[in-house]
């Protein structure tokens, strides 16, 4: 088998309201015709994949169904949210269409490649290093995914219905659309100023500013040499801390230094990470990290250095082994455990040496042995939720500190015996302020329940979720909607409002053309959604673009359907008599001749939606849908959408228009030489025009539905007609004046 075509459908599509990867799989004739050989291949494949896939029934299953099962199993194995898949004939000989929901396109492609390679290896009786390939696939997926800070923030935004667009291969993400967009990279938002971030990186400058505000900070200064470091240590009092002035993540930090040799070694270590080095007084207490978003403390954790308590019998090494048997401890990659294993490394050995111990020492009963001494590495330390233990004075001091630096999201590192008392009462102090704080320590499994850090950051960016969306008017592209898009763009472009338009005649921002290429496709629409100056978006989308790329948005203010694309059915609806839907490993079969209206989009269905119905459902979910009921297929959507549908017709006697008015719904029609807009039995706007047409009818009804005043629309139409008449007369006059010249030339 081989993939003839692979399509990435980002956003709502004909299969699902989630992103889908769709593959067209070609199967060899021999494999299709030889049932015994096929059964043998599937039995061997089921045996090899049984450790992570549900392989029951594979032996008697068709090849592409098995491939689909294996593809889904691989996606789940690497942690992708692949819940559903579909298999059906593509309407071509020996070609089957497979589609799966996926979170990341590149990961889904890699899983498909491995599934095809695995199937081919079994069919050819070749050995394949599946274990190594799976390990490589997991590593690729881990590298490709958003990090442990950005990922939860994106998930929180999507849970609130806020669109998220990944802008690079790292962690730069845009939330929201057009002029309402906001951006984050890890926990740094676009409100984080360059100056504020620079202040936070400079630990000495931060400390000086905090001291001027009267906030408690450790005594210390910047040093320029090893001798100066020793002099500064003697000034501030022992023990001391030596650290880089502008490094992150605890790099180059040495604690509890008491001798000149230790200070000299620590100075050299710090110089590896920064040209400038700080020497500070060592504060006594537990390290704390407090996370602040805006003007609120959202989370706080206390770190207690790993330690053992002697029993008079066992050695240090045996006590560490017992410590690591705590079920709360695990490997760094084990996200279900709040603490890491305590390593038996040089840092622990140094800590033991300072306490006159070694690995084989037997501590006395009740004797405490700290397993961290001079290293700032917190691996193996205990982490405890301290959010509910913060004294009001401490909270105010920390918020003032972050406000002084100028950050909107920050992590404050401080030393305190506990947070239940003011810092000046316990000789605690603020160590530094981080502009790029990690949020994982405030969530499960350290904090149970998790502190709502991602949700707080999203709420900080968008107090109301609907603030993230710009109004989008989407229409199924045809020759009539060209004129509709121009009318609507002109009407919406008022004052300082900037309208982006993607249509068959190019990409536009107001009156400025950004591209002359045909732009009725998802790629061009998405480019306008990323444009920071677009306040409203009017777009045409071709049926082919929607089938091949999906919709670039999950909601719109209005959808316009003037001609049906149903005469060009999705290729998956052509040919074949069986379709298969997979969910959680269970194969389901349906009749491909089932009427499309019976398929439940977003639920278990094997047949894709029509493009018309897809756009109609997206429009009806939050807005309204203008439907040309003169088209027999489109007319069937009116009853399905209810009062979200606005029927329009060239015929005032159209039954759908009459029924809508009798129900109190909105409708529009052409009556004689006038366009009539109505709500129930009340006729809201009657626009006399010498040339009533479907495009103007649709544009007027859409504009009214978007909130444009009827009188404004009437004046706009009148003005455009006057301009058109004046232009026609001027052209005719020029033509008459040029006739003699033309005759002379001839």
Model-derived features with residue positions:
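ATP-dependent carboxylate activation and anion-phosphoryl transfer catalytic cores
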Residues: 1-158, 296, 304-311, 315-318, ...
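Conserved N-proximal alpha/beta basic substrate-recognition cap immediately N-terminal to
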Residues: 100-235, 248
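Short acidic-glycine loop/turn motifs at beta-strand connectors
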Residues: 177, 292-296, 418, 670-671, ...
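Active-site nucleotide/adenylate-binding loops and adjacent lid/helix of ATP-dependent enzymes
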Residues: 182-343, 392-395, 454
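Extended, charge-rich helix/loop segments that form flexible
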Residues: 319-381
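Walker A (P-loop) phosphate-binding motif
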Residues: 465-506
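Acidic, Mg2+-coordinating active-site environments of NTP-dependent enzymes
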Residues: 469, 548, 554-746
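Conserved nucleotide-sensing/catalytic segment adjacent to the nucleotide-binding pocket
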Residues: 513-545, 549
């Amino acid at each position: 088998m081989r993939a003839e075509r692979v399509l990435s459908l980002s956003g709502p599509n004909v299969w699902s309201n989630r992103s889908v990867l769709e593959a067209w799989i070609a199967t060899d004739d021999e494999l299709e015709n030889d049932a015994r050989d096929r059964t043998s291949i599937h039995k061997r494949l089921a045996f090899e994949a049984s450790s992570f896939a549900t392989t029951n029934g594979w032996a008697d299953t068709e090849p592409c169904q098995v491939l689909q099962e294996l593809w889904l199993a691989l996606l789940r194995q690497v942690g992708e949210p692949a819940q559903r898949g579909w298999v059906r004939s593509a309407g071509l000989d020996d070609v089957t269409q497979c589609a799966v929901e996926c979170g990341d396109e590149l990961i889904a492609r890699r899983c498909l490649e491995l599934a095809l390679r695995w199937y081919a290896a079994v069919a050819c009786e070749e050995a394949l290093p599946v274990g190594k390939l799976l390990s490589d696939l997991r590593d690729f997926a881990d590298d490709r995914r958003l990090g442990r800070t950005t990922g939860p923030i994106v998930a929180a935004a999507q849970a609130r219905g806020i669109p998220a667009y990944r802008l690079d291969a790292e962690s730069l993400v845009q939330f929201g659309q057009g002029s309402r967009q906001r951006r984050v990279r890890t926990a740094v938002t676009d409100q984080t100023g360059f100056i504020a971030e620079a202040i936070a990186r400079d630990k000495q400058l931060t400390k000086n500013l905090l001291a001027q505000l009267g906030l408690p900070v450790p005594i210390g200064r910047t040093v320029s040499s090893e001798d100066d470091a020793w002099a500064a240590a003697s000034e501030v009092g022992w023990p001391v801390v030596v650290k880089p002035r502008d490094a992150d993540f605890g790099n180059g930090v040495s604690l509890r230094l008491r001798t000149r040799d230790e200070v000299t070694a620590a100075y050299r270590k710090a110089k590896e990470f920064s040209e400038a080095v700080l020497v500070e007084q060592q504060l006594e207490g537990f390290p704390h990290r407090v996370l602040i978003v805006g003007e609120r403390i959202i989370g706080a954790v206390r770190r207690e250095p790993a330690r053992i308590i002697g029993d008079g019998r066992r050695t240090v090494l045996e006590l560490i082994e017992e410590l690591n048997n705590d079920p709360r401890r695990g490997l760094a990659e084990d996200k279900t455990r709040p603490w890491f294993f305590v390593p038996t490394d040089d840092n622990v050995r140094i800590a033991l040496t300072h306490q006159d111990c070694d690995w084989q020492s037997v501590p006395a009963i009740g004797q405490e042995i700290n397993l961290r001494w001079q290293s700032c590495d917190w691996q193996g330390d205990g982490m405890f939720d301290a959010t509910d233990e913060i004294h009001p004075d401490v909270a105010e001091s920390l918020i003032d500190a972050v406000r002084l630096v100028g950050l909107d999201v920050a992590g404050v590192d401080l030393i305190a015996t506990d947070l239940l008392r003011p810092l000046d009462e316990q000789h605690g102090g603020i160590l530094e302020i981080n502009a790029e704080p990690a949020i994982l320590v405030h969530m499960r499994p350290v904090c149970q329940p998790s502190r709502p850090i991602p949700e707080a950051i999203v709420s900080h960016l968008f107090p109301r979720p609907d603030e993230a969306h710009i109004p989008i008017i989407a229409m199924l592209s045809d020759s009539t909607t060209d004129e509709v898009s121009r009318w609507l763009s002109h009407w919406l472009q008022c004052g300082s409002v900037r309208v982006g338009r993607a249509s068959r005649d190019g990409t536009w921002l107001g009156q400025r053309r950004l591209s002359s290429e045909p732009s009725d496709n998802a790629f061009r629409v998405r480019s306008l959604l990323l444009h920071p100056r677009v306040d409203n978006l009017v777009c045409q989308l071709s049926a082919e673009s929607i089938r091949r790329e999906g919709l670039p948005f999950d909601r719109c203010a209005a959808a316009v359907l003037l001609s049906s694309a149903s005469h060009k059915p999705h290729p998956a609806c052509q040919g074949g008599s069986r379709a298969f839907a997979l969910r959680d490993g269970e194969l389901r079969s349906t009749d491909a001749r089932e009427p499309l209206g019976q398929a439940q989009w977003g639920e278990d269905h094997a047949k894709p939606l029509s493009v018309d119905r897809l756009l109609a459902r997206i429009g009806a979910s939050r807005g309204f849908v203008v439907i040309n009921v003169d088209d027999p297929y489109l007319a069937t959507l009116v009853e399905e959408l209810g009062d979200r549908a606005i029927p329009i017709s060239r015929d005032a006697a159209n039954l759908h228009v009459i029924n809508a008015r009798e129900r109190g719904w909105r409708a529009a029609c052409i009556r004689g030489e006038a366009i009539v807009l109505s709500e129930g039995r009340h006729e809201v706007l009657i626009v006399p025009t010498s040339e009533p047409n479907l495009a103007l009818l649709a544009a007027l009804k859409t504009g009214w539905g978007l909130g444009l005043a009827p009188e404004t629309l009437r004046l706009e139409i009148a003005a455009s007609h006057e301009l058109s008449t004046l232009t026609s007369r001027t052209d005719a006059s020029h033509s008459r004046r040029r006739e003699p010249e033309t005759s002379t030339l001839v």
